[in-house]
Amino acid sequence: MTEPNRQSGEKEERIIEIEIERLRPFKEHPFQVKDDKEMFLLQESIEKYGILNPLIVRPVPDGYYEIISGHRRKHAAEKLGYRKVPVIIRVLSEDDSILSMVDSNLHRERISYSEKAFAYKLKNDVLKRKSGRKKSQVDHKTLRKRSIDIISEDCGDSPKQVQRYISLTKLIPEMLQKLDDEIISFCPAVEIAALKENEQRELLKAMDYAQAIPSLSQAQRIKQLSLSLIHISEPT
């Protein structure tokens, strides 16, 4: 018989096994599941020791379960031919599910810029929604502090850095991929994110044509030029 897993401050939770086919990925999951070296090592570990940490899931209609934490473990187990995986079932609201999903993934050893950017944005959106609710519906921490400050405390980045990451979600996919591939550096990418979509696409064409990447100072000048053009076009 499986021993219950006790979470601090929570009631006892049982670990049960559920068929993989009944598990669905979290619909707003910003973290990529790749067949890379880390996945290979995870498969080796599961093959040798089994799944040591159960997946966290929540029930959804039609007898299925949405994965909150454990997308990579589920993928590795599936590749190894597992039919069932150990899970802990939690009944969570949509917003609490997002917070739990983001927090459980942000502490991974390797996270891409885009994953972190969209994770921070998801968490920021939820915390801002919670701050607009009645006091009885949210904890005191959410009421006292800005959402950016809460993310900063939880994740270790400064509030300014959290804002920079969130701004990256405004990059077009092709530019964001160049950032993840470390073709563009972080700080220039933050400046480029302030450009309109059509401006980013024109810049991308220029980069490809010249086979060159803008430096921070160049990206800042491009951003300032964009802002000045906006002011010129505004009616007086």
Where are the model-predicted features located?
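Amphipathic, charge-rich alpha-helical segments that serve as recognition/docking helices
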Residues: 31-32, 39-40, 75-170, 180, ...
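Short, charged/polar connector segments at secondary-structure boundaries
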Residues: 1-90, 96-110
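Amphipathic, non-transmembrane alpha-helical secondary structure
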Residues: 40-43, 121, 201, 205
